[in-house]
Amino acid sequence: MPIGVPRIIYCWGEELPAQWTDIYNFIFRRRMVFLMQYLDDELCNQICGLLINIHMEDRSKELEKKEMEKSGLFKSGTAKTKGKDTVKKENLSGGASAKRQSVEDLLTSDNDFGIEENHLLEQYTLQKITTEWLNWNAQFFDYSDEPYLYYLADILSKDFSPNQDKDSANLNFAKSSANKQAFQNPAEMTKLIKNLKNLKNFSTGSKNVKQNLDVYSPFRLLANFAPQNYNLEHPNQNLAEIYSLLKTSTQNTNQPFTKKLIDNLSHKELMNRLQSPEKLVASSEKALGRRRLKQRYVQERLGSGGLSNSKALKAYNYLDQGALNNESGRSLYRKQTERVIQEEESKKVFMIINSFGGSVGNGITVHDALQFIKAGSLTLALGVAASAASLALAGGTIGERYVTEGCHTMIHQPEGGLNGQASDIWIDSQEIMKIRLDVAEIYSLSTYRPRHKILRDLDRDFYLTAMETIYYGLADEIATNEVMHSIVEMTNQVWSYHDSKQERLLESRASLVGDSTQTQESNS
């Protein structure tokens, strides 16, 4: 151990003895992680084991709290009924207003991630990659020899933006003048209809039809067929006319399918005739009478016993949320929200990083272990965050990843030496390529960059300064004096919380030691 590295005495529990702990390669006060050396297997196991232990403790506390709420004990005041004003507002709005989200829902919401925008960007990226591939391969063959590639190129040149009109989103494009003229030419339509008829009455002996209707003929025909509107109107709107036409026809009346269709149409026509204004008014008056009768029954039931004692119990029912006015209710809700947010902040994990990396497997393990923490994790890079340490930096909560002004980061692809038989070397090389794809996927999810660009950057050692790290997406902000002050305040909350816990453990241990010494002296 280097000289000057501070060590602290720490109690892990009531049953385990207190021991000295090095704060630079271990977790300090259960919520601080110092990754300031080579990320070897021992350090990785220590960090990940205690991170999972933190997750299990937080999860057990949440389950205990939910069980207490289900049992009916210690219910909070927010679970009470709403006031009259809020009920009136909801009735006036017609129930269209959304439900108020709780604090936990706001903390765990995914609205800030922009999943739909990322999906659209991925679509554009894949579309661009495929188009570039087709353009590159166009020098080796002709599209006329491979008609399906021509059709694919036409499809990929479409604009799938959400601002585009639905009418302009055609199967094939009519942007060019040639396509527009082909669409306006009725000869193409007649050609399409004739070929479809020939396809229906296809015979094996006709050679001319085979030449016209080969495998790629639909693509050739659709390349010249670009309709402007596929929103076809429903042909069965007037059910009465269809019913009369089917009734007059005598050819297919003996078939069971036609009889069933006529019965369904007649039933629908009967139901449409029953929905007259007079009958609608009668049914609405009947429903309104039932509702009024139910309201009177509820009022009589409450007036007999509940309303008589409501005024007497109003002064003593201090947990009744409806009895409070608007200002007191807002202040109570604000205090509860602040307390919940403070509790969540006290559960956050802080990771300080200054490392040249280590094994890629250990870096992926630390990154995955940070995702277990529900309250989030704050990562701060000092000096260097290279190789596997950059995975730990990217594993923090998005928006709470910081780098100092002089920090440098580096990413590269996995490396390693292989020896053995040729088949074993080939199997190990395939596994390394899979790990390379996994690392690129982690960086892609953390930086919102396409995976093919990440793979291009991972080909060699890719060094980044502090600002380049932020632009790249591995970090979110430079740790200035103001940011460091806020980080110190958050860590002070965690330290004070765990300081009190450590003091209680040490006091209980000291009392147990004092009792044991007194019993030994009395026995002697």
Swiss-Prot record:
The region called Disordered is annotated at: 74-96
Instruction: Give residue spans, biased composition: Basic and acidic residues.
Output: 82-91
Record field: catalytic activity? Hydrolysis of proteins to small peptides in the presence of ATP and magnesium. alpha-casein is the usual test substrate. In the absence of ATP, only oligopeptides shorter than five residues are hydrolyzed (such as succinyl-Leu-Tyr-|-NHMec, and Leu-Tyr-Leu-|-Tyr-Trp, in which cleavage of the -Tyr-|-Leu- and -Tyr-|-Trp bonds also occurs)
Q: Which GO terms describe its biological process?
A: protein quality control for misfolded or incompletely synthesized proteins
InterPro entries in UniProt: ClpP (IPR001907), ClpP/crotonase-like_dom_sf (IPR029045), ClpP/TepA (IPR023562), ClpP_His_AS (IPR033135), ClpP_Ser_AS (IPR018215)
Q: Recorded E.C. number(s)?
A: 3.4.21.92
- Grouped into one coarse class, the protein's main location is plastid
A Pfam family annotated for this UniProt entry: CLP_protease
Places the protein is found: Plastid, Chloroplast stroma
Q: Which GO terms describe its cellular component?
A: chloroplast stroma; endopeptidase Clp complex
Gene3D superfamilies for this protein: 2-enoyl-CoA Hydratase, Chain A, domain 1
Q: What's an example of a GO molecular-function annotation for this chain?
A: ATP-dependent peptidase activity
Which keywords does UniProt give here? Answer: Chloroplast, Hydrolase, Plastid, Protease, Serine protease
Q: Does the keyword Protease apply?
A: yes
> Which SUPFAM superfamilies does the UniProt entry name for this protein?
ClpP/crotonase (SSF52096)
Region annotated Insertion IS1, chain positions: 60-345
Spell out the catalytic residues: S387, H412
Protein family membership: Belongs to the peptidase S14 family.
- Subunit text: Component of the chloroplastic Clp protease core complex.
This chain's function reads: Cleaves peptides in various proteins in a process that requires ATP hydrolysis. Has a chymotrypsin-like activity. Plays a major role in the degradation of misfolded proteins.
- What does the UniProt entry state concerning the protein's domains? This gene contains one large insertion sequence (IS1) that divides the clpP gene into two sequence domains. The insertion sequence forms a continuous open reading frame with its upstream and downstream sequence domains.
Please report the name of this protein according to its UniProt entry. ATP-dependent Clp protease proteolytic subunit
Q: From which organism does this entry originate?
A: Chlamydomonas reinhardtii
